[in-house]
Amino acid sequence: MNSAQKKPQPPPLSLPWFQSVNRFWVQNQGRFMAKIMPGEYYVTNQQELIGTVLGSCISACVRDPASGIGGMNHFMLPQNAGGGRMDILSDAFRYGNYAMEHLINDVMKLTGKRSTLEVKIFGGANVIRGMSSVGDKNIEFVRRYLEVDGFKIASEDVGGDYPRKILYDPTNGKVMMKRLKSLHNDTVIQREEHYMDELSHTKVAGDVDLF
C-alpha cells in the first residue's frame, strides 16, 4: 500500500448537519465516501466521494467547478400527493422543491455562487412493481425544476429498467455509474418502497428560501 492509499485518522470533518450520514473508507479510491440513503443529501468541502444506489429515485449532483465544493441528494416525489398533478401548488412538487433547494442552498452557503453551478442527474428507473410511472414522474420533476430555475443539465443518465450505483466526486465533477442488471436481493426495491410509504405519512415542509 502506498502512502496515498493509507486510511487517514480520523475522517475529514463533515459539516455539522451531516454528522449522521454514514461515511467509510473506500480502499480502491483512497478516500472516504459518504453513503446517502433515500431522503438524504450530503454536501462536502473536503476531498470526499458521495455514493448511493438508485432505483426509481433521483439524484442530482451539484457542484461549483472553481472550488470543487458540491453535493448530492437522493429523493422521490410522494405518489399520493396532489392526485397526480405536477404543478407548483401540488405537495409532490413542493416536496421535490424542498429536496433540491436544500442541496443547492448548502452548496451556495459554502461558495456564494449560483450562476456557475454544474448539475448532473441520475436515476428514475422503473423498478417498483406495479408502479411504472414513479421513475418517470421523478425525471419529469427534476428536469422541470432545473429548467424553471435556469440550470442547464451538464449530463444525465435517467429512466430505463435497472437500478444504478452512483459514485460522485465533487472535486472534479466525475460520476462513476454502474447499471445493476442483476441484483442479488431486493434491498434497493424494498428500501424505496419503505421510503415511499414514509412519504405518504409525512407532512410536506414549508417553503425554502434560496440564497
From Swiss-Prot:
SUPFAM superfamilies named in the record: CNF1/YfiH-like putative cysteine hydrolases
Record carries keyword Hydrolase: yes
Keyword Hydrolase: yes
Molecular function GO terms recorded: protein-glutamine glutaminase activity
Pfam families found in the cross-reference section: CheD
Top-level taxon: Bacteria
Name under which the protein is recorded: Probable chemoreceptor glutamine deamidase CheD
Record organism: Hahella chejuensis (strain KCTC 2396)
Designated gene of the protein: cheD
